[in-house]
Structures are given as structure tokens and as C-alpha cells.
Amino acid sequence: MVKNKASSNAYRRLRTNIEYNSKYPNVHSICLASANKGSGTTTIACNLAITFVANHSKVLLIDCNINKPTINKYFSIDNALGLSDMLLNQDYSNYYRYCTNFKDDHSNNLLYVMGTGRKVKNTLDLLSSRYFQE
């Protein structure tokens, strides 16, 4: 997805800074958010996930923007089943059922991409529920 060497290096540098951050040495999740449409959050999230999968056996990228999903378009995946379905079904231990996986060409590691799933009326309630926290 990263098209040029300078961008690739920038994402690898960002990944390394996150991995070796002494203030938070055991980071297992990262949230990228923006208040402004078109600020590049999806591009950064997707490229950072791809960069992480080169060094880690499994990476899970979740599109939490249920009202305006975009990650499914970036990876050309179906958005019919995803995060909202997993939360509504309380089936979070079987997250892989709601994902599409991609194998990294160089490392054979897996990138799991979870789309938003079906649209729901109570998006904020769903994302602030204890099920999402788990």
C-alpha cells in the first residue's frame, strides 16, 4: 500500500518508535482517530498495520467508524459482517470469524482486517459498551 521508499521508511520509523516507547513498553493496541474528515487517518492506520505485520505474527486492524466505513474500501473487502455484528452477537472470542486475513509476502505473518459490519442505530452505545472494551 505504501507507494514510495520515503513513506515506507516513515512508517517503519513510526512502528519502531511505538514498539520501543519506554513510557508504554507493553503496548498491545493503538487507536487512531481524527475529528476532521480527510485527514489521512485511514491511510495511516492501514499502512501502519501493514508495517507492523512484517515484525509480528498477527495484527488485527479494526474499522470502528460504523457510520462511514473506509478500511473495507482500502483492502477491497466485504463489509457485510464485522465489528458491529461481533459486538451485537457478543462473540468477541471468535473475532477471526468477522475478519478477512491477508498473508504478508515476506514474513508469512497474518494481517486480520475487520470491517465495521452492518450499520446500527446506537453506534456510540455499542462502542462504549463493556463488550467493546473486552
Task: Describe the predicted segments one by one.
Residues V53:
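Gly/Ala-rich phosphate-binding loop of Rossmann-like dinucleotide-binding domains
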Residues M1-R12, T16, N21-K23, S34-S39, ...:
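P-loop/Walker-type NTP enzyme "switch/lid" segment
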Residues P25-I30, T41:
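Pre-Walker A (Motif I) flank of P-loop NTPase domains
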Residues T43-I44, L48:
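Hydrophobic positions on the alpha1 helix immediately C-terminal to the Walker A/P-loop
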